[in-house]
Amino acid sequence: MLNSSNILLTQKTQYFTIFLIKIVKKFIYGLKINQNQINIYINTTKMLYLLTFLKNNSISNFDKLVDIVVVDNISNINRFEITYFFWNMIYEYRFGVKLFTNGFNIVYSVSNLYKSALWLEREIWDMYGIKFLFHLGLRRILTDYGFKGHPLRKDFPLLGYVDIYYDDSIQSIKVAPVELTQSLRFFKFENPWNKWYL
């Protein structure tokens, strides 16, 4: 059951969605609304224009970048789905901007607009290998500087490439190749439970 505050949030979200569609419809190619959260789908080339407008416009005023999330859909051509989550403190809107890339397309850094993006984009590059153009300090943040590869990609080996361990006999850290090699993985995208659903 909806209480009155949820109805107001939903009504505000509807008004903002109408405003958004009228103003920035040339930048977006998809729209999805869930209660008081709006998700739009954009091209990577239009991203900076749209986010600059949404931050500086007095109606939208998305002044807080809460998080950047990446999903690796290895079966798609544009396998990485990047979602930026914004928050409007005044009107209490949650807002998601989604874009798709194959990892080689240009994704512009939003660190000039939102300072919280500095760490988030570094983490995405470290874990997924997606490079952000015009990011000033794109370097490793969660793995070692000599680490090879990006561990959250679906095609990264489960055991990694090297084994790092402390050798008590020589009192130092050793790096050795992984002794148990993993065979090439083939991904099955079929779901055995699909036959029970319509």
Question: Where do the language-model regions lie?
Answer:
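Terminal low-complexity/charged segments
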Residues: 1-198
